[in-house]
Amino acid sequence: MRLEVEARLRLGSFAIDAAFGSEGGVTALFGRSGSGKTSLVNIIAGLLRPDQGRVVLDGDTIADSERRLFTPVHRRRFAYVFQEARLFPHLSVRGNLAYGRWFAGAARSGPEFGRIVEMLGIGHLLDRMPSKLSGGERQRVAIGRALLAFPRLLLMDEPLAALDDARKAEILPYLERLRDETRIPIVYVSHSVAEVARLAERVVVMENGRVKASGKTAAVLNEPFPTSGPGRREAGALIEGIVDSHDEGHELTVVRAGDCLIRVPHLVAEPGQRLRLYIAARDVMLATRRPEGISALNVLPGTIVGLSSPRQGSIDVRVDCGGNVIAARVTTLSRDALDLRPGKQVHAVVKTVALDY
């Protein structure tokens, strides 16, 4: 199901001038706070009316300024999950879910109720009130309510932003199931590279109200020396792998990525499950000999395949570690002291706790 968006809108001194297309699955709108992500998703939802532009979903024109066509919010059949769950405090979990069913009609949503409740792991919460739920539980209920409205498009505006790290880790597996088990296209707003890497098939990078880059997630996030991707501070590498095993005693998960085994904090995932990890360049150290007696658990042998130009006294070094290219940010002093150059054998050192998301 293809989504096409073109929008121009002035909001005081800030202007949106953006266009993108996606082919279903999860499309992430990524960028720093104030980049225009939420304004753009609100245009898609119909909460903001653009000065110029159009929104087309699967060939159906939802809005078109040239034709003076603007479908009201309640007729778009789009569902919106906000940063805060926004559950009705006077209704139980079951009552909140029933509100979503009301939009679709009880007969239509009846067979799906049990499947969605099971997929989101909220069956044991049905009789609780929102005040008795954790932040992660409230968001899962909000997602369930949205799904039970049978939307044509699901919009999610930073659904994990208000959660602490533990609650984020709790809810991410459910978002992966949502992505994998439903055919509903999703526009997912986030400023977290790790979330985007783990969930999205495509990413649209926003900056100052404009689209700075767009494409498949791996291509955008793995841009060798980013000038148009996620930005230098967030630069790194997306690694695809499978869950190899769990170390329950130490609450770790071992991920096999190419020829490498990478230890990460415990993930709720079955052995053999495919997943993606994002390793930020600023979290990687390089050593010319395998270091001993260090706390970092991931020491990955590899070969340097590229170095960026110096910027503010540092460079990004790309290292091929068993078929996966990892980026490391080091100072120019370290480059000279270690004689870092293409073809040199090194070890990339990554702290396990740096991969905690």
UniProtKB/Swiss-Prot annotation:
ATP binds at G31, R32, S33, G34, S35, G36, K37, T38. Keywords: ATP-binding, Cell inner membrane, Cell membrane, Membrane, Molybdenum, Nucleotide-binding, Translocase, Transport. Residues 293-357 form the Mop domain. It is found in: Cell inner membrane. It catalyses: molybdate(out) + ATP + H2O = molybdate(in) + ADP + phosphate + H(+). It is a peripheral membrane protein. Its EC number is 7.3.2.5. It comes from the Bacteria. Residues 1-233 form the ABC transporter domain. Gene3D superfamilies: 2.40.50.100, P-loop containing nucleotide triphosphate hydrolases. It is an enzyme of class 7 (translocase). It holds the Pfam family ABC_tran. GO terms for molecular function: ABC-type molybdate transporter activity; ATP binding; ATP hydrolysis activity. GO terms for cellular component: plasma membrane. Part of the ABC transporter complex ModABC involved in molybdenum import. Responsible for energy coupling to the transport system. The complex is composed of two ATP-binding proteins (ModC), two transmembrane proteins (ModB) and a solute-binding protein (ModA). Belongs to the ABC transporter superfamily. Molybdate importer (TC 3.A.1.8) family. This is Molybdenum import ATP-binding protein ModC. It comes from Rhizobium meliloti (strain 1021) (Ensifer meliloti). The gene is modC.
